[in-house]
């Protein structure tokens, strides 16, 4: 049983007396605001409040600068006891909201994170606190701001209404500069990514470093170690909640001096960066063509805070081309995962669903809850994420100005299909295969070794930031379409998404690919299944004998291992990253336990059949993969171990 913490007697550290003058100045632009805005007090409460409502500190109007002399706070030391299981996964700590709402649960993790960071990244530092807007986010922002103040942080940057996409947070860490020249040293990102949101659903928190990327294992391991021994945390309990619905800077005074909360527009910084990467004028011409139609589904996640500004206001798309682009705490009751199962409305509109009506648009796309994942669709055509990153890499230099001077290298996660490998070989590019988790790409990017990278789990990105970026991927595809059609916008027929993919297969071959997810299975059963797969690798002749009994026509396994990665930049080693069976014809079976779920275990089976013969690249994926699917299910004994006769999701 997880222990609840008993009330503690706090130790209070009082602020040094400091008299401030009342003053009013002229509002300034977001990047050059004075750090000395002051707020007024009024009473209000968070929509998802779980703690006693406190007076809100706020600027009177957007951009207003008001000085107050009495907004001071003290620091309280709260006794606490550890909670079990606060181990950050590949993308932070994800649990049910009700778990995070337990006394001191969030505070324990936040303090453990502060304690794991170098002192200069906390004391006097600037940090970002925002996320995808899911339920409990607004409360979490206030708690973290109070703890940041108590731990000596100089200022906290918050996206308006607590909304910042994960890629936008990365961009802000890397690009935004305060009036006194300070940059953010890191960020608490409040997201459980593609997991559902709401009072009974998931919440998550992860820390990103000063390069804009997720904390490396050396830091997350230290955070986890701290959570197991924590005895106290610091918090400024008398700091008023800040009204995060209004932009402006609110300042306070504490024992270590001034502390600011800067609430700013969620989209401006990100849009400024993205416009330096893509040729917006060429994309506008494509979207203006009467022969081109477009649809974007935000799945009621944070992408909605960017979609209208980018696709409608900047690029001229019709507002009717946007679906579910109002961010909601519960994602409209849906599952904000951009795949063929959960993005049903978009899938139907694109002519791929059972209830599809009317003529589909030429191009469709979706993003997940925190807008770092993406799905790309053509008219009645699905682009696998593995193909997507390979096609972007193959066309980037010609289509995207940011890459005009060439690619430094490309990388993919191990479970992602080898389509990118073939592109890299043909274009003579550096290529890297890394474990699942975007932080592994970050090291390569920081070392100037990688420009474009991707994951089979609908994550694609580049070295413009240190996170995967759903909207970047959509704009990359629009750029490729714009380039392919630049001399044909007035023609009878545009080059389509399907045309581009078919041309790619004709050049590089096709990697038929699918993923079977078995969610929330018994954790012990999952471990036993994986252990048996490792044990089988000791004798490949026996493995091949078993395979021939299942499917005689399937090629022999020529190599099998448990994937291990040695980082070429820092030499760190990551073990137990998935089980691989590699076949003589370039096909693969991969088995992996996922670290992103909040309950139970998720077994993922990746099935890949490579076809070089261009005359055979047009088969139905299910037909081409059927023999290997049969082998994967029977070789792993998935039903025997889990009791499941079918996967939860097939991608």
Feature roles, as predicted:
Residues 74-83, 180, 199-358:
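Gly/Ser/Thr-enriched, mixed-charge loops and adjacent short helices
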Residues 1-48:
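N-terminal chloroplast transit peptides
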Residues 115, 123-201, 267, 309-376:
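N-terminal small/polar loop signature for handling phosphorylated ligands or for N-terminal nucleophile
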Residues 83-99, 193-195, 298-302, 306, ...:
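Conserved phosphate/anionic-ligand binding catalytic regions in large, soluble enzymes, centered on
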């Amino acid at each position: 049983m997880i222990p609840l913490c008993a009330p503690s007697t706090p130790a209070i550290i009082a602020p040094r007396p400091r008299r401030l003058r009342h003053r009013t100045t002229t509002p300034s632009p977001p990047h050059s605001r004075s750090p000395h805005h002051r707020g007024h007090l009024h009473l209000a409460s968070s929509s998802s409040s779980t703690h006693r409502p406190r007076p809100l500190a706020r600027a009177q109007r957007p951009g207003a600068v008001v000085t107050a002399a009495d907004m001071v706070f003290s620091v309280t030391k709260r006794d606490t006891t550890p909670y079990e299981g606060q181990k950050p996964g590949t993308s932070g700590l994800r649990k049910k909201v009700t778990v995070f709402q337990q006394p001191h649960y969030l505070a324990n993790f936040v303090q453990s994170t502060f304690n794991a960071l170098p002192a200069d990244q906390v004391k006097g530092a600037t940090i970002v606190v925002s996320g995808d807007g899911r339920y409990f986010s607004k409360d979490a922002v206030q708690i973290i701001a109070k703890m940041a103040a108590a731990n000596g942080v100089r200022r906290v940057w918050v996206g308006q209404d607590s909304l910042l996409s994960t890629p936008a947070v990365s961009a802000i860490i890397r690009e935004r500069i305060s009036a006194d020249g300070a940059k953010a040293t890191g960020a608490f990102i409040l997201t459980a990514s593609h997991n559902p949101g709401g009072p009974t659903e998931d919440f998550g928190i992860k820390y990103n470093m000063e390069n804009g990327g997720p904390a490396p294992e050396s830091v997350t391991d230290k955070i986890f170690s701290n959570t197991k021994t924590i005895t106290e945390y610091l918090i400024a309990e008398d700091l008023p909640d800040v009204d995060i619905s209004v932009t402006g800077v609110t300042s306070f005074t504490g024992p270590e001096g001034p502390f600011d909360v800067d609430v700013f527009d969620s989209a401006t910084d990100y849009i400024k960066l993205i416009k330096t990467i893509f040729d917006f004028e060429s994309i506008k011409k494509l979207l203006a063509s009467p022969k081109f139609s477009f649809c974007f589904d935000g799945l009621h996640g944070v992408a909605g805070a960017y979609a209208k500004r980018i696709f409608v206001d900047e690029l001229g798309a019709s507002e009717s081309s946007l679906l579910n682009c109002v961010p909601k705490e519960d994602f409209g009751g849906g599952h904000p995962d951009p795949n063929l199962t959960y993005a049903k409305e978009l899938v139907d509109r694109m002519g791929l669903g059972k209830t599809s009506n009317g003529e589909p648009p030429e191009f469709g796309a979706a993003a997940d809850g925190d807008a770092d994942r993406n799905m790309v669709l053509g008219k009645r055509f699905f682009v696998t994420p593995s193909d997507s990153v390979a096609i972007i890499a193959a066309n980037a230099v010609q289509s995207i100005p940011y890459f005009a001077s060439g690619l430094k290298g490309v990388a993919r996660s191990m479970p992602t299909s080898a389509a990118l490998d073939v592109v890299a070989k043909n274009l003579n590019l550096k290529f890297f295969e890394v474990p699942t988790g975007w932080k592994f790409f970050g090291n390569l990017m920081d070392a100037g070794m990688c420009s474009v990278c991707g994951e089979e789990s609908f994550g694609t990105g580049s070295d413009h930031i240190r996170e995967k970026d759903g909207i970047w991927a959509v704009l990359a595809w629009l750029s490729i379409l714009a380039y392919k059609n630049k001399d044909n916008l007035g023609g009878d027929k545009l080059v389509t998404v399907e045309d581009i993919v078919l041309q790619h297969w004709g050049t590089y071959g096709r990697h038929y690919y699918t993923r079977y997810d078995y969610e929330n299975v018994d954790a012990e059963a999952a471990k036993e299944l994986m252990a048996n797969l490792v044990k089988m690798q000791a004798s490949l002749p026996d493995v091949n004998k078993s395979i021939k009994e299942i499917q005689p026509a399937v090629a022999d396994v020529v190599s099998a291992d448990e994937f291990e990665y040695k980082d070429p930049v820092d030499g760190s080693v990551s073990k137990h990253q998935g089980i691989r069976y590699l076949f003589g014809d370039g096909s693969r079976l991969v088995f992996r336990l996922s670290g992103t779920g909040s309950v139970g275990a998720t077994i993922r089976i990746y099935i890949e059949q490579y076809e070089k013969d261009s005359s055979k690249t047009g088969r139905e994926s299910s037909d081409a993969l059927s023999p290997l699917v049969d082998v994967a299910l029977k070789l792993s004994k998935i039903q025997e171990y889990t009791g499941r006769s079918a996967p939860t999701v097939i991608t």
